[in-house]
Amino acid sequence: MKLVIDDACYAYREIFDHFGEITAISGSDINANSVKDADVLIIRSRTKVNQELLSGSQVKFIGSTVVGLDHIDQNYLKTKGTQFFSAQSCNSMAVAEFVISTIVNLVDELNFDYQKKTLGIIGVGNVGTKLAEKAKLMGIKTLLNDPPRQIRENLDNFVDLNTALSADIVTFHTPLTVNGEHPSYQLLNENNFHHITNKTILFNAARGGVIKETIWKKHKTLANIIDCWEDEPNINPSLQNTAYLATPHIAGHSVDAKFMGSFMVYEALCTFLGKKQDKNIRNLINLSELSIDKSNLKDTLNEIYDFQQDANAIKDVNNFEDYRRNYPIRYEWHHFKSKTVLPIA
């Protein structure tokens, strides 16, 4: 069996080697010639999966080790009869930790009490749910907006989009969709940006394109935190230069998230092939407990991981892709023992 794998997939040799012959290629370099003889294709977000890539191939299984789906033509895969799996939820804890860590750092920067602020969470799926749980532990009031989920589950504790946009802190965690009853493409745009004021802290840790950047750069906010960009890796210099934190789409890049992305695809491939799983694969991320000797939450979180280093790394925007590919080691909070109680939910 021949496997073509994006070489940025975590521990791909250790996890997938026993399935067959591996060809590892940079995701942006995977093309029709690369996959024409492959049986399995395992990717991240930089490979466009469509008819152009696959029309001359024999690929039977495609696994994506990331959450985003806007680079996948799922309708074409269905017509071709190609099995597809995406590692949904693999990075949800990492993104929630990114948002909470940034809010805690902003407390000192802007001198506010987060327990007196409202947090508007737009998109309450895997990430939004975990973020809401952490916010509750910290005493932050949340305003939850997710029309598809609200309708599907008949939830009465959700709010409309304009109410969520009026929160003190607004953060987006939707997928990027352009069709359907509730498309998220340019969800925040010239028609509703007036709800965002010069007292709003605004996050995009969802997908580039959820916020219309040509409008965003014209509006004054209290602080912008931007991890996802419309035209990655060509990020908007005006927004980058005025942001409190501008990072290269790494909110979900914890070691745990990258491992789970690969592991979830491994599980799906085992199921597809009818193979028994190797229980030792899970041991690739087993760690001894790590200790931190800090006396407050901000210092503890920054000792675990200081996201400002990510912003500093892409002051030269040409470093965007290289930095993502060679991202520093970052473990999630549950690995750490600390004097300070961490909002682990």
UniProtKB/Swiss-Prot annotation:
Function: Catalyzes the oxidation of erythronate-4-phosphate to 3-hydroxy-2-oxo-4-phosphonooxybutanoate.
PANTHER family, alphabetized: D-ISOMER SPECIFIC 2-HYDROXYACID DEHYDROGENASE CATALYTIC DOMAIN-CONTAINING PROTEIN-RELATED, D-ISOMER SPECIFIC 2-HYDROXYACID DEHYDROGENASE FAMILY PROTEIN (AFU_ORTHOLOGUE AFUA_1G13630)
Class in the EC hierarchy, top level: oxidoreductase
Upper taxonomic lineage: Bacteria, Pseudomonadati, Pseudomonadota, Gammaproteobacteria, Candidatus Pseudothioglobaceae
Protein name per Swiss-Prot or TrEMBL: Erythronate-4-phosphate dehydrogenase
Location in or out of the cell: Cytoplasm
Origin species: Ruthia magnifica subsp. Calyptogena magnifica
Binding site for substrate: 45
Keyword list, A-Z: Cytoplasm, NAD, Oxidoreductase, Pyridoxine biosynthesis
Keyword Oxidoreductase: yes
One Pfam family per UniProt: 2-Hacid_dh
